[in-house]
């Protein structure tokens, strides 16, 4: 009986610790080079009120692929990356827009609703290969332009930032 009580107490203690960590919104620390920093209205962080990610921590969120044409490449191209809605859910983003900044200081503002409505991704790979900085990488916001006619216009092309380095949720 004492052994059973002790085991139940251990299970309760472990459950409490795990639940407390989930409520705290503490994300795992990246071990590699940080590629992306999220800030602003986010609940889950790992770096002084921000959420930082390396390649491995982004890939752990789950990757998807789609083929589409775009103004930047000839023919259909396969992009592989993290669904942006999944990334926003993971960090507990709340707000109406995301201010995206690229390595070259290009900025664009994207409605948060785009990510769910259009299944936009944060691409890490093009045609199965990691994107290099000189090839619009390492991170590129891509919409499945061929899936809906409304995505084939300058509004969505301008939201498709490449060399993405940070996102501020407002």
Regions from the PLM with identified roles:
Residues 2-10:
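Positively charged n-region of N-terminal signal peptides that target proteins for export
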Residues 3, 25-170:
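N-terminal intrinsically disordered, low-complexity segments enriched in P/E/S/T
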């Amino acid at each position: 009986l004492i052994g059973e009580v002790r085991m139940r107490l251990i299970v309760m203690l472990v459950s409490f610790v795990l639940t407390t960590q989930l409520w705290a919104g503490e994300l795992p620390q990246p071990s590699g080079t940080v590629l992306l920093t999220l800030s602003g209205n986010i609940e889950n962080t790992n770096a002084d009120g921000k959420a930082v990610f390396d390649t491995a921590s982004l890939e752990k969120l789950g990757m998807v692929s789609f083929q589409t044409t775009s103004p930047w490449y000839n023919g259909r191209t396969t992009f592989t990356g993290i669904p942006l809605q999944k990334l926003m859910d993971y960090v507990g983003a709340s707000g109406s827009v995301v201010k995206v900044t690229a390595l070259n200081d290009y900025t664009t503002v994207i409605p948060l609703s785009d990510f769910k409505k259009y299944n936009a991704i944060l691409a890490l790979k093009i045609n199965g290969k990691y994107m290099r900085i000189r090839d619009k990488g390492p991170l590129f916001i891509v919409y499945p332009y061929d899936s809906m006619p409304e995505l084939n216009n300058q509004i969505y092309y301008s939201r498709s930032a490449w060399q993405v380095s940070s996102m501020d949720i407002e």
